[in-house]
UniProtKB/Swiss-Prot annotation:
<keyword id="KW-0614">Plasmid</keyword>
<dbReference type="Pfam" id="PF09392">
    <property type="entry name" value="T3SS_needle_F"/>
</dbReference>
<protein>
    <recommendedName>
        <fullName>Type 3 secretion system needle filament protein</fullName>
    </recommendedName>
</protein>
<dbReference type="InterPro" id="IPR011841">
    <property type="entry name" value="T3SS_needle_YscF"/>
</dbReference>
<comment type="function">
    <text>Component of the type III secretion system (T3SS), also called injectisome, which is used to inject bacterial effector proteins into eukaryotic host cells. YscF/SctF forms the external needle filament that protrudes from the bacterial surface. Essential for the calcium-dependent regulation of T3SS and Yop secretion. Required to block Yop secretion in the presence of extracellular calcium. May be the extracellular T3SS component that senses extracellular calcium and/or participates in transmitting the calcium signal to the cytoplasmic compartment where the block in secretion is initiated.</text>
</comment>
<comment type="subunit">
    <text>The core secretion machinery of the T3SS is composed of approximately 20 different proteins, including cytoplasmic components, a base, an export apparatus and a needle. This subunit polymerizes and forms the helical needle filament. Forms high-order oligomers in vitro. Forms a stable ternary complex with the YscE-YscG chaperone. Interacts directly with YscG but makes very little direct contact with YscE. Interacts with the needle adapter protein YscI/SctI.</text>
</comment>
<keyword id="KW-0653">Protein transport</keyword>
<comment type="function">
    <text>During infection, can induce innate immune responses. The needle proteins interact with host TLR2 or TLR4, and induce signaling by NF-kappa-B and/or AP-1. This activation is MyD88 dependent and results in increased expression of cytokines, including TNF-alpha, IL-6 and IL-8. Innate immune responses are modulated by the N-terminal region of YscF/SctF.</text>
</comment>
<keyword id="KW-0964">Secreted</keyword>
<dbReference type="GO" id="GO:0005576">
    <property type="term" value="C:extracellular region"/>
</dbReference>
<dbReference type="GO" id="GO:0009986">
    <property type="term" value="C:cell surface"/>
</dbReference>
<keyword id="KW-0843">Virulence</keyword>
<dbReference type="InterPro" id="IPR037203">
    <property type="entry name" value="T3SS_needle-like_sf"/>
</dbReference>
<dbReference type="InterPro" id="IPR021123">
    <property type="entry name" value="T3SS_needle-like"/>
</dbReference>
<dbReference type="GO" id="GO:0030254">
    <property type="term" value="P:protein secretion by the type III secretion system"/>
</dbReference>
<dbReference type="GO" id="GO:0030257">
    <property type="term" value="C:type III protein secretion system complex"/>
</dbReference>
<comment type="similarity">
    <text>Belongs to the SctF family.</text>
</comment>
Length: 87
């Protein structure tokens, strides 16, 4: 499982750029795993083990990108709420 170390060390992540940077490596790793699984299927497209590995890689990729999207949306909503309270 990917390590979201920026969120577990008790450090403050106060801006959207820091959040995006923290999530970049797990997203890149998941993307690479999907691409590697697809490349492995080119030689043996009917291998059940390789198909299962691709399914797992795609599921992991999907979860990581959903987490990324949710966090970015939450940060946007938080910042928008703060800005709306200013006169």
């Amino acid at each position: 499982m990917s390590n979201f170390s920026g969120f577990t060390k008790g450090t403050d992540i106060a801006d959207l750029d820091a959040v995006a940077q923290t999530l970049k490596k797990p997203a890149d790793d998941a993307n690479k795993a999907v691409n590697d699984s697809i490349a492995a299927l080119k030689d043996k497209p009917d291998n059940p083990a390789l198909l299962a590995d691709l399914q797992h890689s795609i599921n992991k990729w999907s979860v990581i990108y959903n987490i990324n999207s949710t966090i970015v949306r939450s940060m946007k909503d938080l910042m928008q709420g703060i800005l709306q309270k200013f006169p």
